[in-house]
Amino acid sequence: MIIYRNYDQKIDEKLIIKIKNYCKKKGNKFLLSNNIKLAIKLNLDGAYIPSFNKNTKHLSYSLTKKFIILGSAHNINEMNTKELQNVNAIFLSSIFKKNKNFLGFYKFKLLSHLTKRPIIALGGISKNNLKKLNLINCLGFAGMSFFE
């Protein structure tokens, strides 16, 4: 699954369509961040709602059953917001990376049990701590540095 996230520049629809076609050829799902309306218009596989987006306007949109909505959260309030936004799964961070949103292993585990939504672990996952994910309630993990 590929999520296109670029908050610094205006969205280039032609580029999004190129990436969509590439993902389709390779058998990958392609989601657009923070723009559900455009994801629907361009017939993408879904959309990603970042933690700072509290909007529920998309609940009135007509979506196909296959349309995926993912969201991210760093605390219980944001998790509740993602549930109100009716996301299919929640990226919860940060499990290992010590940043401003650092949860740590035990707080992450506790928060992951406070929702019925599938949880995807995020933040500082490496070859060294990958096995620890078997000890928590998560569907899987995501990252950038892990795959570099």
Segments predicted by a language model, with ranges:
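Glycine/Thr-rich beta-alpha phosphate-binding loop at enzyme active sites
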Residues: K41-S51, F67-H113
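Glycine-rich phosphate-binding active-site loops on the catalytic face of alpha/beta enzymes
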Residues: I49-L59, A89-G104, I125-E148
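Alpha-helix C-terminal capping segments
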Residues: Y61-T64, K82-L84, K109-T115, L133-I136, ...
